Amino acid sequence: MLCKTGGCVEGRAAEDQSTRKVHWGQEGSGQSPEARPRALDMISRLEPSRGPSHAHWWHIISPQLAVMLEETGYPVEKQLEILTFLYHWVIPYLAPVAAGNAASSCNWKSLLPSAIVPLEYSWKWDSSGKAREPEIRLTIEVFGELSGTQFDPLNQAPAMELLYRLSSILPGVNQILASHFRCKFFDHDNVKYMEEPRLDTLPRSTMLTYMTPRKLGQQGFAPLSEYVSAIQALGQASGRTLDTLTNFLSTSPEGVHLHPFGLAFDNVEPSSSRLKLYFFSNRTSYNSMREVLTLGGRIYSESYDMEEKLRTIYSLAQLLMGCPENNAEDADIPLLPITHSQHTAAERATLLSGFQYYFDVAPGADLPSVKFYIPVRKEHANDRAVGSALTGWFREQGRGKFCDNYMRMLERLAGGLELGECRGLHSFISCMIGGDGEIEVTSYLLPGSEA
């Protein structure tokens, strides 16, 4: 399960981390003791020990999260609240640490990109037209001692337990959608799931904060029909939004290139929840992105220049993916050869070579909202280069207020390495055009760094 603070949940395809090397630096955090945030020192002094596994994850994660909260300007009291939640509600649900194996449960392979820590951070950038700071969220994969065993072959039990327990302190948490999609997406013969061969190209993690359908005998990713039938079975008002999306997928030239790989939802009352369908495409041209983000011309605006917004978004993709300046609008961004990946070419083509999108088919909407994900190709850019390109783009948009904080945060997360030597802190950068025309941008960051 992938859970985000703030009650929303989402997931994306994992990236290739086969060559990842993590350097934690001093105190396991990549920062000197005197640089430790005040809120972290307070929690660390006052909270009692909860065993070696808890101490292991707290030692790694808390300094990183505390740094991000500090650099985004969260008040100290809010930092204390979030770190206390981390201590009592997040850390206990990370993988048990076995002797000599701190990476994951010995029976379960994490879906999340980092092979070292089953979590991902996100930094949602501030908006120029709104008086607010960046938002920090933490995505985790929930584990239990029996994850991956015959009792819980798809690692679903810990997620349901966490949702149940959180409902006692967060009244808005609701398990209806989790139970519904769990019933629709999976068979219920644990013995047969254990007997099936492991499919390394298919995410084994299922009941996350998003779900990936997996029926017995299924090869590869589930077809769109699996998602559509499960959503329709809810009997809600999302029908017309879903119909619009399926019509686009069946009539647009880009539809055949979009492949579903997951569904995300908020664990709240179904009538209030977003329903986000995730797709990947190997197409990376401007024309392809434009077709998808406008839903074939169905999404437009009379209050701002949609074409200008789309070109601004694509300029960021070009910067981050190393696109030649003279690339034609109908030409994909060249995929440079990978020299040190151990993953197969098929896996790379499936999950990493192109763009990713989600479509929100929430009840009551006429058209789905669309978010666009740019993969960060760590084989060809270190994290200083990625951070510099991203902050340079923000400054060009007149949104440079937190750029220095962002680069300083990256330096502090680099685990004692020079940032130019790090690869792998960034995984994706997402963009979405808000209702007011503001381009909403989020950076997705991984714990540790790669030399």
Swiss-Prot record:
L-tryptophan binds at E120. Transmembrane segments: none annotated. Residues 14-37 are annotated as: Disordered. Its EC number is 2.5.1.-. GO terms for biological process: alkaloid metabolic process. One of its GO terms (molecular function) is prenyltransferase activity. Keywords: Transferase. Pathway: Secondary metabolite biosynthesis; Alkaloid biosynthesis; Mycotoxin biosynthesis. It catalyses: quinolinone B + dimethylallyl diphosphate = peniprequinolone + diphosphate. Substrate binds at R137, R274, K276, Y278, Y373. Belongs to the tryptophan dimethylallyltransferase family. Prenyltransferase; part of the gene cluster that mediates the biosynthesis of the aspoquinolone mycotoxins. Within the pathway, the prenyltransferase asqH1 catalyzes the canonical Friedel-Crafts alkylation of quinolinone B with dimethylallyl cation to yield dimethylallyl quinolone. The first step of the pathway is catalyzed by the nonribosomal peptide synthetase asqK that condenses anthranilic acid and O-methyl-L-tyrosine to produce 4'-methoxycyclopeptin. 4'-methoxycyclopeptin is then converted to 4'-methoxydehydrocyclopeptin by the ketoglutarate-dependent dioxygenase asqJ. This is Prenyltransferase asqH1. It comes from Emericella nidulans (strain FGSC A4 / ATCC 38163 / CBS 112.46 / NRRL 194 / M139) (Aspergillus nidulans).
